[in-house]
């Protein structure tokens, strides 16, 4: 009814590093090099919203939406992205598109020309994904320029302002994913759930997780039940994103679960106590974390093979197929057989 799950690029099955932190170019490169020194493999690096200018004049509103590099932190974006690619790392940037494209943005002159905006009055390009002209400007004048610099895919973090009968996040996921399919390695985005059919635009994520045992306790259930609506490639902030207390046992157990989750994406907030670098923990915890992160990359051939099977072989859930059977009968009947329960 809603379509199959697409094939992910192979690199998406590896370890993701993400943190809400104002990295400078040197800090980020040193971090990635430290992972290599520690023999911890990474496939994807994610720069949260501080990659772009956030401290903007009050007349433009908030700094959550942005598309212009913060050159105080990243003075030469092309060089940074090339250096990351030289290290075999894919890069994703975080975007909050709700506030449109405003006059302080580097891309604004191109956008204003395409949309016929009054530049002298700093007329903004209001976010409207229902408008084909805005979508064209959004991709061609803003995102394509950044992709040309080396951005591999986009993290669509949030979208407010529902219009009409359709959530704009659904449109963002649809058009962003379809656009990303132009890449030779296949389409990929990271975004929140926007309703039934969202599994067609992987990867999804659950939003900010609280650092607590209760939160970890919920994640296996949440991840498994995402498949009930077809969301195979579901992720969450492994280790927790915010609040909570420093707890090495919690971090260890969470990472162990995360490595066997569909997507292994470490993420945390700006707090200096929440970061997930394995070498920041005790020797015992660090050793375990490194072991499991290495294991994830050893599993990639197995995961990729099963991903292909997921796409090629579609199966009716057994509970729906044999509704008259009770769950115990079904479990006994399907024991040791590959089947969706």
Predicted regions: what they are:
Residues 1-341:
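Catalytic-domain carbohydrate-binding cleft regions of carbohydrate-active enzymes
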